Amino acid sequence: MKKKTKILIYVITFIVVFLISALIRIMLLGSAPERLIKVEWDESVGEIYSNHDYENDNVNQYDLYIPSGLDKSENQYLILFIHGGSFNSGSKEDGESWCKYYATKGYITASVDYTLQNQGKDASIYLMNEEIENAVKTIKQKTEELGYHIAGMAPCGVSAGGTLAMNLAYNGNSAIPVKFVFQLAAPTYFAPSEWSLLMKVDRLNSEEEFYKMMTGIH
C-alpha cells in the first residue's frame, strides 16, 4: 500500500512539475514559431496592400505584401497563407507574421479571408475552395497592375487552412501555377465518425449536416 502511495505521489509530482515548466516556457518564450519569424517592417522592407476585395458574396478580402527591390523584368513568386480555425474561426490577420517573414526573403505574399462555417452563410469547403481560387485570380490581376509577373505560387496554411491549401494545390483550378504546397497539421480524412469534436464545435447535429458542410451538397 505504501509503495503504491509513493508511486502515486511521484506521478502527481511529475505532472505538476511538467505543467509548471511548460507554463514558464510559454510565459518566457511565447509562441516560439512566431518569434522565429518575427521581422521588423517598415516602408524600406516592403509595401502592404490591406483589405482588398475579391469576388465573393460575403465581403471577404485579402492582404498583399510586396517586398522592396523586386525586379519587374524578372519572374516573381507568390506564397499564399490560408488561416486555420476548424473552418469556423480565424482571419487573414493570422498570417501577418508569416507574410512579412517570407516577403523579407524576396517573395510576394498574401493572406486571405474566406467564409467561415459559423457565419450563417451556408458555408462549405466547396465554397471556401471556390473563394480562394477567386482570390488567387484577383491577386494575379493586382500584381500585374503593379507591374509584376507571378510565374508560380506556393499555397500554405495551418490546420483547416492547410487542408484548403492542399485543395488549391491539387484541384488544378489555380490561376497561378502551383509549384508546391506546404502546411502544418492539416487534416485529409473526413469520415464523420472521426470528427465528433469538430461536429460539436461547429454545432452540427448529424452526419448529414457534416457532409453538407464538407461538400455544399444539400
Question: Residue ranges of each PLM-predicted region?
Answer:
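N-terminal Sec-pathway targeting helices
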Residues: 1-17
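Alpha/beta-hydrolase superfamily serine-hydrolase fold, recognizing
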Residues: 17-218
